[in-house]
From Swiss-Prot:
It is a peripheral membrane protein. Produces ATP from ADP in the presence of a proton gradient across the membrane. It is found in: Cell membrane. The keyword Cell membrane applies. It comes from Lactococcus lactis subsp. lactis (strain IL1403). Its main location: membrane. This is ATP synthase epsilon chain. It comes from the Bacteria. NCBIfam families: ATP_synt_epsi, PRK00571.1-3.
Length: 141
């Protein structure tokens, strides 16, 4: 493999959802956003709910977007592995389903705040963050 190319694999409990070469990746870890180049120093980090941006070597103008809902990223040599709770490529996101999830989360958050239930507030905020992330990533079509 070329020194300027790495392989990105995104794995979820449902299986492998992405397995391609890349020459640049951005991801949001629990410590902030990182840019990943081939042959970087080995790293393991937790991932936030956010989008992955993947620039592939076969088309410098195209970026693949993936909605990631938490997980772990491992960078080792020319292999980047992400094990995520769930993840979807932008082309696979059902926008109407994501919109419905957003509405449900907003309603749940409103009820939880009215009842002052902190656990329910936290769950609703995470659900809302996931839905908004999916909607954001789906807009990159």
């Amino acid at each position: 493999m070329s020194e300027n190319v790495m392989t990105l694999q995104v794995i979820t409990p449902a299986g492998m959802i992405y397995d391609h070469h890349a020459n640049y990746i951005t991801a949001r870890t629990t410590n902030g956003e990182i840019g990943i180049l081939p042959n970087m120093i080995s790293t393991i980090a937790g991932l936030e709910i956010d989008e992955l941006k993947v620039r592939r070597p076969d088309d410098e103008t195209h970026v693949d977007y993936i909605a990631v809902n938490g997980g772990i990223i491992e960078i080792k040599d020319s292999l980047v592995t992400i094990v995520a709770d769930s993840a979807e490529r932008n082309r696979d996101i059902d926008v109407s389903r994501a919109e419905r999830a957003k509405i449900r989360a907003e309603k749940a958050l409103e009820v939880a705040k009215a009842e002052k239930k902190s656990d329910e507030i936290n769950r609703a905020e995470v659900a809302l963050h996931r839905a908004l992330n999916r909607l954001n990533v789906s807009s990159h079509r």
